[in-house]
């Protein structure tokens, strides 16, 4: 058996050297997330069910990074989370939500609540714009009434191609918050809102796609419905997919990568997790656009304890980055990042970006409710190979969970914990970015 030295973040320090930078404002943190996607800060929120859904992904994109929506949702739910992110920051919303004028007020209330929006465009049987209903219209209205009775019928609109400055002028002139974009035949082509214009100005460093919408990623598995899930996520506007499996250097992962790339050759694909140079090369040859590195290094991951397998994270990143550089494929360091210094070391050792989980768990934007214990506030944070996460997945997939049957077949490689409530993720990202 051959033994080699392996280093983790705590084993090294960066040697200070001369710098000609006189202000932090002179630094540029932009980097490659994958072969064809760049982000403005090198941070990615982990695809974990206690870290990233739409709220976290929106915050990450606004700060200049990107969030990866976890896959432990139904296909429809996960695609809807992607849509929420895409609609949160686009100057013009394509395919805005609309409802038939024949529907009831209750239908409108239920639809608006489900989509988490404050207003709806109203269309006739020919899909032409006939009105608009807002929160104020729906407030205290008789739920049995018709939308056509309460909607605003004289709707101010603009033509496709309207300039942003002109749209702002129209919104101000008419004291309205929503401006439907309608063609000559009355068909809706988009929607501009005052909130989206404000967000666009407030977050100049935001990570955006070519259409100006926030960047967002989503995870898929390697078995079952992964191709169907991939198709739905891409249709929803997902910018990058992450093939998510604990041991990425495996036949299951490589087969899934090849199948996804064959069915969707233009999709941007990240895969992992791996921890060796050979694993990196095999995934790259299978067709990935970035490789996620880290086995057992996460704060709530016990893979190394249970399986005796893993590579210290700094060494793993260095080994994998050498291969990534040869092929021009970015490396994402995933795991072991407990401080901003750890992130710096990961980048210095060859990673293009850093996936963070534990640092973001417990924030306002992470899924879950705030719990109070002994006068202190906490949120749940768990590894995706933990028993609790497995129970949650099994229950979603089958609608039930048998403690006698299912527990006998499962070996946990992660744990669940309560982490202190941390407030908004914005402050953490500022600390990470310096």
Question: What kind of region is each of these model predictions?
Answer:
Residues 1-18, 22-25, 100, 159, ...:
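Alpha/beta catalytic cores of nucleotide-metabolism and tRNA/nucleoside-modifying enzymes
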Residues 38-44, 91-96, 209-219, 260-275, ...:
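Short beta-strand/loop segments at the ligand-binding rim of alpha/beta enzyme cores
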Residues 55-58, 228-236, 275-293, 333, ...:
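Catalytic cores of alpha/beta
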Residues 62-77, 184, 238-250, 289-307, ...:
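Glycine-rich phosphate-binding active-site loops on the catalytic face of alpha/beta enzymes
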Residues 69-72, 98-99, 119-121, 157-159, ...:
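Catalytic beta/alpha-barrel core
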């Amino acid at each position: 058996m051959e033994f080699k030295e392996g280093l983790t973040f705590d084993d090294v320090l960066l040697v200070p050297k001369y710098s000609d930078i006189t202000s932090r404002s002179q630094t540029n943190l932009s980097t490659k997330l994958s072969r064809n996607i760049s982000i403005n800060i090198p941070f990615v929120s982990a695809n974990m069910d206690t870290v990233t859904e739409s709220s976290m992904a929106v915050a990450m994109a606004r700060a200049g990074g990107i969030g990866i929506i976890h896959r432990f949702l139904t296909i429809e739910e996960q695609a809807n989370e992607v849509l929420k992110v895409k609609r949160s920051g686009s100057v013009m919303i394509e395919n805005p939500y609309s409802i038939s004028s024949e529907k009831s007020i209750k239908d409108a209330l239920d639809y608006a609540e489900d989509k988490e929006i404050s207003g709806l465009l109203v269309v006739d049987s020919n899909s032409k714009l006939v009105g608009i209903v807002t929160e104020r219209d729906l407030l205290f209205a008789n739920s049995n009434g018709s939308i056509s009775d309460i909607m605003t019928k004289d709707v101010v609109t603009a033509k496709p191609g309207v300039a942003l400055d002109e749209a702002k002028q129209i919104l101000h002139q008419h004291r309205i918050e929503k401006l439907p974009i309608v063609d000559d035949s009355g068909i809706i082509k988009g929607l501009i809102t005052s909130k989206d214009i404000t967000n666009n100005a407030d977050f100049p460093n935001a990570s955006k796609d070519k259409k100006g919408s926030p960047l967002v990623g989503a995870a898929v598995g390697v078995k079952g419905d992964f191709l169907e899930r991939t198709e739905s996520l891409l249709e929803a506007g997902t910018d990058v997919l992450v093939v998510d499996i604990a041991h990425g250097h495996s036949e299951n992962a490589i087969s899934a990568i090849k199948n996804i790339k064959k069915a969707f050759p233009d999709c941007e694909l990240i895969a992992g997790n791996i921890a060796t140079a050979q694993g990196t090369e095999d995934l790259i040859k299978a067709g990935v656009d970035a490789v996620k590195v880290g086995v057992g290094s996460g704060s709530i991951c016990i893979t190394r304890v249970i399986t005796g397998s893993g590579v210290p994270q700094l060494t793993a990143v260095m080994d994998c980055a050498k291969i990534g550089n040869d092929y021009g494929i970015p490396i994402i360091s995933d795991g072991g990042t407990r401080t901003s210094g750890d992130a710096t070391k990961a980048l210095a050792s060859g990673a293009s970006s850093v996936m963070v989980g534990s640092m973001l768990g417990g924030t306002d934007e992470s899924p879950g409710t705030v719990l109070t214990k002994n006068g202190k506030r906490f949120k749940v944070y768990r590894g995706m190979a933990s028993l609790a996460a497995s129970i949650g997945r099994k229950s979603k997939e089958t609608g039930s969970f048998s403690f006698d049957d299912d527990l006998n077949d499962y070996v946990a490689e992660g744990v669940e914990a309560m982490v202190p409530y941390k407030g908004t993720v914005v402050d953490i990202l500022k600390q990470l970015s310096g």
